[in-house]
Amino acid sequence: MKYRLIVALAMLVLSLPSQAERIKDIANVQGVRSNQLIGYGLVVGLPGTGEKTNYTEQTFTTMLKNFGINLPDNFRPKIKNVAVVAVHADMPAFIKPGQQLDVTVSSLGEAKSLRGGTLLQTFLKGVDGNVYAIAQGSLVVSGFSAEGLDGSKVIQNTPTVGRIPNGAIVERSVATPFSSGDYLTFNLRRADFSTAQRMADAINDLLGPDMARPLDATSVQVSAPRDVSQRVSFLATLENLDVIPAEESAKVIVNSRTGTIVVGQHVKLLPAAVTHGGLTVTIAEATQVSQPNALANGETVVTANTTIGVNESDRRMFMFSPGTTLDELVRAVNLVGAAPSDVLAILEALKVAGALHGELIII
């Protein structure tokens, strides 16, 4: 029943006609993007839920040296309230120095929980190695863990990952090509030649001929003013322009782990017959030992006794006529009571046989 509901909902969604969407909802401006930042730091103040790994001690010792505290070479600090963590954040486009970012903090070692901890000053670097933000602050951890003396343990959610809202201050901005050049380029989130052409046509209808041209299935190039203030208002007008996206190509998407199957609107089948059923073969091996009388001159003989059982379940066959559509396909699959795993095997066989007109995608 659950499987039928999933397929029915997918059928309803994918069979809806294409509606006009704003350019800002289906495309991004090239060069206007976020950047990922990452850092390595220490969380302190943990209530005995930290770690004692070698790299934690080394990082802790290095931090003390930076504050002018030198420990003996053979001294190993006993720390239970410290954890080594990875800190990462997304830096949106156009963000300026002084603005703040949310950061996520994740334990790298054996720490049992980060609840109650405080992240010390951590440099967040970009892919180019430059520092773009500095993070510090108290963690918000939704999970928790508790452990008894007998080894019993209770864990809820993930206590080794936390967040710091507005926990990083931006120190350097990232340059974008938005304000340079004679063109702006829109990149479709889903590549499609028809949608790219329709977007260019809609922009040309608004601005005039030859103002926009599709470069490929993803990109549409638009002539833009050089003045930055004019470019902002120009883009604000374009991103709210309505475009009717092209209909999706025929696809069948199957999640082999969860059994979810989504069938696109234009999936059709050529004439085919499918048999649904199962064949169970049971092979049992039993060993028999023949032990002769102690006074006889015989030898002990070991023989194998093999029993093979075959159990064939009821087979059901259904046929598809030419041009069978989504509705008939789903109805026929439900009629034979096929489970999602069975449907996956049926779809793969139909694709190999050339009877399935559509792209079969297994994720």
From Swiss-Prot:
Signal peptide extent: 1-20
Source organism, top-level taxon: Bacteria
UniProt GO molecular function: structural molecule activity
GO cellular component, one term: bacterial-type flagellum basal body, distal rod, P ring
Gene Ontology terms describing biological process: bacterial-type flagellum-dependent cell motility
Subcellular location: Periplasm; Bacterial flagellum basal body
Keywords, comma-separated and alphabetical: Bacterial flagellum, Periplasm, Signal
Family: Belongs to the FlgI family.
Function (record text): Assembles around the rod to form the L-ring and probably protects the motor/basal body from shearing forces during rotation.
Record PANTHER family: FLAGELLAR P-RING PERIPLASMIC PROTEIN FLGI, FLAGELLAR P-RING PROTEIN
NCBIfam families hit by this protein: PRK05303.1
Subunit structure: The basal body constitutes a major portion of the flagellar organelle and consists of four rings (L,P,S, and M) mounted on a central rod.
Protein name listed in UniProt: Flagellar P-ring protein
Organism this protein belongs to: Shewanella sp. (strain ANA-3)
Lineage of origin: Bacteria, Pseudomonadati, Pseudomonadota, Gammaproteobacteria, Alteromonadales
